[in-house]
Amino acid sequence: NSEIFKVCNYIRQKIEDQPNYYSVKPYCITLSGETDEKHRDYKIIEGKEPPPKGYGRRIIISTNVAESSITFTDLVYVIDTGLRYEKYYDPKKYAYVGGKVYIARANIEQRCGRTGRTNPGVCIKMYTKAQYENQFQQYPSPEIETADITDSVLRILNLPFVGGNMINAYKLLNQFITPPSKPYLDR
C-alpha cells in the first residue's frame, strides 16, 4: 500500500509543480483493500461525486483490489504494470516473505476489463509480448502452494479417520486437487 501512496504523492507533486499546464487538474486518489466505502474519495472513485473544485479527470492508483471488487464509471484508461505484491510462506525460513511478482493472465483480463464498461476504453500494458508469453502463468497459483499450512495439517491430524497419524495426513493432503508442495509438508 505504501507504494501506491508514493506514486500518488509523486503525481500530485508533478501537477503542483506545473500549475499553469493544466486547464483542469487531474485528481489523484489511492484505492486499496483498506479504503473505506464511506470515505469521500471512494465516492469520487465510483463516480458518484465529482472531484474537488478545480480538479477534473480522476487518476486512481490502486492495488489489485481494483481487479474485481469495484465498478468504475467512465474509466477510460488502465495502466497495468503486470505486477503485484505478494506474501508467501518460505518453509526454509519458517516465515512469510514478500515481493513483487508477475500476475497471471487471468488477472490481466480482470484489470483491463475495468475500462470500457460505459464508454470506449484503453488498457496500456507496461510489459512486452515476450514477457506476457514467457513469464505470466494462465491462472494464479492456488494458495495451498504458497501459504503456511501448519494449522491445516494440525486440524487434519485431529480428524477421526486420520487419527493423529502423519502418514494418513500426507495421503489425504496428496488427494487434494492441488496438493501442497513437498517442502511445505516436509517441515
Model regions and ranges:
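P-loop NTPase motor module signature
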Residues: 1-187
